[in-house]
Amino acid sequence: MLQRLYVHNYRCLENFELTMKEMSSALLIGKNGAGKSTISSALEVFQSIGRGINRVRQLVQSKDFARGRSDVPIRLEIEVLLEEKLYKYILALELPEKFKELRVFEEQLLVDNNILYSRKEAQVNLYSTFQNREAQFLVDWHLVALPLIQEQSESDPLRTFKTWLAHIIILAPIPSLMTGDSYGETLEPKRDGSNIGEWFSGLLGRYPAAYREVDKYLREIMPDFQDFLNELIGKDFKSLVVRFEENNANLSVNFEDLSDGEKCFFLCAVVLAANKFYGPLFCFWDEPDNYLSISEVGHFITSLRRSFKNSGQILATSHNPEAIRKFSNENTFVLDRKSHLEPTLIRPLSDISIPGDLINALICGDISL
């Protein structure tokens, strides 16, 4: 899964490196503005490329240069271990003088240090067998090449990598936008969770047994939960309805009318089922404890960590003491910025000497790098 993320000259991230080798789960902590959400934005660039978005202006804009420093390229690198092969993807974007839109300066995909394709500006070199040049062609320098290159088979490393990128889950849910209605199916959830209905429909449409996994989790966390229906309301239009039962009395509730926290329970259940049935997946969840009561946070975080322990990988952020306590020092990274004019720093919590209790140190603002 994710081994290394490197970002340079992108917003507050300069020469930034996150290493997650042999970690099934990890936590990012730090003050507001330290750069936690910016990491998710960098990951979202890779996710968008995997989902077929290749116009550079739809991925990165001129305002994304660190402190407006457009004379230095934005560089994004990701290393992923898939099927015991190490994939490394490099993308560098520049903004030449008098240009209004960024263009691709460099792009490269390697598998186990063997080049699949390389690119310098508009020139792309594609290799069929490692180190034997197969073809050269030109690509508009305002387009990322990865989505354009046709994979040759189901087992093609290009297909494997692009599918993994497309299936990256990045979440910062806004429950008020999560209605449970769906006009189609997808396996690609949106950051705000607004297409949970389509995601749920896509999951059950392809993997009917996923219903059991979702049902199991919801019963653990809501004792009066009975079942749920994805009702067909009209042509290609479905709506989620949740049913509860207590003392032989029944109640049906439209998904839209559930509380914010209950919607997040459903979202968590779908994440767990997705990782089991079409994973292993990489999930970045920005503050998963949001909208949850204190008594629910521990179980919620533990369920996520347990699900991803043997398959997949989850990276979370949090300011919540209960969530932070569920991660060890070795699985926790501290982010810090001295000011808005300086870049994000990162260190494992295990490498930092903390006087007394971690939570008290965070409350008092005593942790700095």
Description of each model-found segment:
Residues 246-248, 256-285, 295-299, 307:
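GG-anchored amphipathic helix commonly corresponding to the ABC/SMC/Rad50 NBD signature/C-loop
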Residues 17-23, 275-278:
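Phosphate-binding P-loop
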Residues 87-227:
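Electropositive, glycine-dotted interaction segments
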Residues 35:
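Conserved glycine(s) of the Walker
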Residues 298-369:
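C-terminal lobe/lid and adjacent interdomain/linker elements of RecA-like ASCE P-loop ATPase modules
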Residues 1-14:
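N-terminal pre-Walker A segment at the start of P-loop NTPase domains
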Residues 29, 38-102:
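Conserved P-loop NTP-binding catalytic core
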Residues 32:
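The conserved Walker
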